[in-house]
Design a protein with these regions (language model features):
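Glycine- and small/polar-enriched repetitive beta-structure motifs of secreted/surface proteins
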Residues: 1-195
């Protein structure tokens, strides 16, 4: 191997490294498949374990970014955070199962246990709060607050700020709800504003 400035601790950590540099793998199989990827940090069993050429990823927690192969610029903190991400880049998942199903989606932010739980290939979503945007399979939604936009599936360009705001919304788009339980009964109505 000609890689430099790498640190590995744990069975199988950084096991496949050839030329990658500035990687840190702590835990069983952490960064275990990395060959040429660089500037990655993996702490926890199987964190970033299938990463091969991805750069500048941070994974802290068992299974964090486990399926990532060539993705870059992701941050996952928490057990199984961004677990299924393979090639999606620029994602942030903080919390148990945060963004766990994202595979190829980009620029998603999931902060809170099970935030963005169902999102897979979608991009540009922000979910902050316990199970915020949990059922989401659409792009460009913003939910801040516990259970905000909880049931949203295909609705796009919605903004929900406050716990339970727009939590029953499923397919409606371009709604803005600010405040506790704002527009919480709305399911399919579009272009509504409640402040």
């Amino acid at each position: 191997t000609s890689g430099t400035d790498n640190t590995a601790m744990g069975s199988g950590a950084l096991d496949a490294l050839t030329t990658g540099g500035s990687n840190t793998g702590l835990g069983r199989a952490a960064l275990g498949s990395t060959t040429t990827g660089g500037s990655n940090t993996a702490v926890g069993r199987s964190a970033l374990s299938t990463n091969s050429t991805g750069d500048s990823n941070t994974a802290v927690g068992r299974g964090a970014l486990q399926a990532s192969t060539t993705a870059s610029g992701n941050t996952a903190v928490g057990k199984d955070a961004l677990l299924a991400n393979t090639t999606g880049s620029g994602n942030i998942g903080i919390g148990l199962d945060a963004g766990t199903a994202i595979t190829t989606g980009n620029q998603n932010i999931a902060i809170g246990n099970e935030a963005l739980l169902a999102t897979t290939t979608n991009s540009g979503n922000t979910a902050v709060g316990y199970i915020a945007l949990q059922d989401n399979t659409a792009d460009h939604n913003t939910a801040v607050g516990g259970q905000a936009l909880l049931q949203n599936t295909t609705g796009t360009r919605n903004v929900a700020v406050g716990s339970f705001s727009l939590d029953a919304n499923t397919t409606a788009s371009e709604n803005t709800a600010v405040g506790y339980a704002a527009l919480s009964a709305n399911t399919t109505g579009a272009n509504n504003t409640s402040v």
